[in-house]
Amino acid sequence: MLIREGDVNDAQVLAGLLGDLDYPNTPEAIAERIVVMAANPDSRLLVAESEGRAVGFISLHFIPQIALAGEFCRISYLCVSSESRGEGIGQQLLDEAERLAGDRGCDRMEVHSHTRRVRAHVFYARAEYEESPKYLMKKLTPR
């Protein structure tokens, strides 16, 4: 298993993986977002590759804190192809994300996971992630 930086050549596969999680996207839209992420030093996109084929990814965002020194790392998406689940790929991606966050001096990892994603909750609990205070959200209409 190879964990590498993602790039625009991964857009087709990432669009499919996100579609499997009910986030339908076009490869073109994903490619645009990959370019934006690649230009941001506080974002990382890691891809898991098996036998020359992308089978999963994790996207990370490093966020500075006002009340505490250092940053924390937020996982925005972690997806593994349905045929590759149960092979430890998600854990390998998470391990690499945690290593990168530690190298940057982050004091914690955060992930928000919808209540309906019960399997994801079990995965994160096995990785010693704890449920924390309530997460509140308000949807905005982009201008």
Regions found by a protein language model. Name each.
Residues Y77-V80, G86-R99, R126:
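Conserved acetyl-CoA-binding loop-helix of GNAT-fold acetyltransferases
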Residues I63, S81, R85, H114:
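Residue-level recognition of the GNAT/N-acetyltransferase active site
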Residues M1-I3:
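Extreme N-terminal starter segment of soluble prokaryotic enzymes
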Residues D20-P24, E87, E130:
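Residues at alpha-helix boundaries and the short loops/turns that link adjacent helices
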Residues Q91, D103, T115-P133, K138:
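Conserved active-site alpha-helix within GNAT-family acetyltransferase domains
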Residues L94, A101-S113:
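Conserved GNAT acetyl-CoA-binding A-motif
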Residues G70-S82, K134:
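Conserved acetyl-CoA binding element of GNAT-fold acetyltransferases
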Residues E5-G70, S76, K139-T141:
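Acetyl-CoA-dependent GNAT
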